[in-house]
Amino acid sequence: KKSEGTELVLRNLKSGKETRYAHVVSYHLSEDGKHLVYAAASKDSTADGLYAINTNTRDSVAILTGPADYKKITLHEKGDQLTFVTNRDSFGAEQQEYTLYHWKTKAKAPTQIAKFGTRGIPSGRWVSEHGNLAFSKDGKKTLLWNSAQTGNRKRRRNTQR
């Protein structure tokens, strides 16, 4: 069953100014508070997408949009890049397949890093939407989970960026 998000309110505590974002299912704030990233979803999928907000200017960027689930959004501690998984390419199919993406705040679009069949993902395994993602301290590597169709999970390091 597709979930529908709720309203997220971003309030500047000094000025009291509020900005509201509809259909939010998950959100993440960078450690320095300068970047807010959120996933949106609506029952009819028209609002589905992943968005980034500069909290100082309130400028918004659509990272990736379209009918899908956007999960495991992970910001690097500096807030200048993120990784996430989505089933955008298989949304609505009986068997959902997730793809790992990487995005930098200055990039126009995210980069596809891994999915079923890519180098670094063992044969018969695919990107899992259940495991956590993590960045290395320097932000040059991403740690991801991949799983077999049986549901067994195994940690793999993916250095293809």
Feature-to-residue mapping (PLM):
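Blade-terminus and WD-like Trp-Asp/Gly-His loop motifs, strongest in beta-propeller folds
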Residues: 1, 27-37, 73-82, 127-128, ...
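Short loop/turn segments that connect beta-strands within beta-propeller blades
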Residues: 12-16, 54-58, 104-108
